[in-house]
Amino acid sequence: MEPGVGGLLWIPRFRQAGITSFDPRTEKFQTWPDLPEYTDDRSIDAQVAPAPDGTVWYPNLDSRTLYRLDPKTGHTGVYPMYPDFHPEKAGAGIIIQFAYNKMPAGHFTYGVAADSKSNAYFCDIIGGNIGRVDAETGKVTLFKTPTLNSGPRRISIDSQDRAWFGEYYANSVGMFDPKTEKFKEWKAPTPWVGPYPAKQDKRGDVWTAGMSTDLILRLDPRTGKFVEYMLPTLDTNIRHIDVDNSSNPIAVWVAEVHRGKIAKIEPLD
């Protein structure tokens, strides 16, 4: 669930092939189904990214298409995320191995975000790419991470329009700067953390976590130094964190998937 323009909350419907908005003021829901020509019993809408211009980006993971909904008109634009990738035409089927390979073996989207210009960015966890869709032209561009098959996932955009993401297979945090179209990567100090999300706070530090440990990591990109925080509860399976920049000090909220709890971290420095 992600907040959008006008205070609306946007909810991907996962295997229900669509997205839903909720207006807290009226307590009303509205649902937009996927376009029928791109929908089947394997359709998965797992992520959503509201843009500053009021449109909403969300990927259909099975068809490898990115939708852009305009709630005012109800129009949905469709953008192939991997235009040159057609495994079904080669007789290879559409099932892609969702695991580490020494070489990239296909494409699978795992994370989407919108920048200040309403462009969409997405993570290609299987192909090791960061993708961008130009909001004005619809052009799709893939940028390969420096580490081969790094496993990027759960992307976010900072105040400078830089993209931050976990590199799950490379055990690193990655950043893509659209101004230079260059990457930077920072290796986590503890093996097998498997960074999942990555989000920057108002001080410039970047927070990440991995579902294979119970560690929350804070990165100072200026020095490359990490600080690790061990959660008091073990076997939490961390897949999502969020940074609250409205408080002082800032707060980091952590979803403990296996334990059904939410943790809050307030750094003292």
Predicted regions and their residues:
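A generic tandem-repeat structural signature
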Residues: 14, 27, 34, 41-71
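A short loop-to-beta-strand structural motif that recurs across blades of beta-propeller domains
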Residues: 18-21, 65-68, 129-132, 172-174, ...
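Short loop/turn segments that connect beta-strands within beta-propeller blades
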Residues: 23-27, 70-74, 134-138, 177-181, ...
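Long terminal segments
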Residues: 241, 252-258, 264-267
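Ankyrin-repeat and related helical/solenoid repeat scaffolds used for protein-protein interactions
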Residues: 186, 201-252
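Beta-propeller fold detector
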Residues: 30-36, 77-84, 88-91, 141-145, ...
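Beta-rich, blade/repeat-based domains predominating
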Residues: 1-6, 37-53, 85-117, 147-162, ...
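Conserved beta-strand positions in repeat-built beta-propeller and related beta-rich domains
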Residues: 4, 9-15, 56-62, 105, ...
